[in-house]
Structure formats: structure tokens, C-alpha cells
């Protein structure tokens, strides 16, 4: 297995992700993307629409769960429309989001890594909901009373 570092993971601002969601692909390269929400018990009160939920606590403990995520992501990328941009986030994207991105990164070989671009959503869901919580086109299950 190859060795990668956090430099292989970039940060993405919520405004850029919002733009991607509105356009249906990344802005510059027109590539597909997938949001992965790694919150655990704090996965309530809303989530980014069409995001996949893979709790970090399970990803770090269960190799099969991580393989499932990796398989789904590589399968989604298999359509040949360029690299799949994978955006991880947790509540603040300070620990679990970056750690989950590193777990996936370390599970990829060189060929697989060439098929993915890894991101962490800057500010996590907390920042996302403060701007886009009420926007039902990009946020699902939002409960504003939990955020006041």
C-alpha cells in the first residue's frame, strides 16, 4: 500500500460545494462529486442533500465498513466522467471529517487515488447549516430549532 499524507486532502468552502450542487458537477473540471457525512450521534437536525452517512466511529473500527464506502465511491466514479470528488464532513470538520478522509486515503492504491480527489468541508455541517440550512434544494431534514 502506498503512503499518502494530509497534503493529498484539500479543504472546500461551503459556497463552492453549493455551486457544485446547483450545477450537478464540479465547477472547473465538470467532474462528479459525493458528500460523505461522518457524524455519529450528532447526525440529527439536518444533512446535506444526497450525502452518504458513514459514521466515523464505525469507519475507524470496522474495515469492512470502510471497504464498503471505498467500493461505492469507486463504483460511482466508474462512469468515466473524470475523477470523483469526495467531500467529507462532520459537525465542525476539525477531527472526524479529516480523519475519515485520511482513512479512505490510506486505503487507496495509486491507481485508485488517481480516480479520486479528497476534500474536507470547511467548517463542517455547523457552517453549512448556518448558510444553507433553510435551502431545501441542498439541505434535507433540517430542524432549525436544534440550531438556535
Curated annotation (Swiss-Prot):
GO terms for cellular component: cytoplasm; nucleus. Transmembrane segments: none annotated. The modification N-acetylmethionine is found at residue 1. InterPro entries: Rhodanese-like_dom, Rhodanese-like_dom_sf. Keywords: Acetylation, Cytoplasm, Hydrolase, Nucleus, Protein phosphatase. Pfam families: Rhodanese (PF00581). It is found in: Cytoplasm; Nucleus. PROSITE patterns: RHODANESE_3. GO terms for molecular function: phosphatase activity; protein tyrosine phosphatase activity; thiosulfate-cyanide sulfurtransferase activity. Optimum pH is 7.5. Residues 29-137 form the Rhodanese domain. Its EC number is 3.1.3.-. It comes from the Eukaryota. Its main location: cytoplasm. Present with 2310 molecules/cell in log phase SD medium. Protein phosphatase. Belongs to the MPI phosphatase family. This is CDC25-like phosphatase YCH1. It comes from Saccharomyces cerevisiae (strain ATCC 204508 / S288c) (Baker's yeast). The lineage of its organism: Eukaryota, Fungi, Dikarya, Ascomycota, Saccharomycotina. The gene is YCH1.
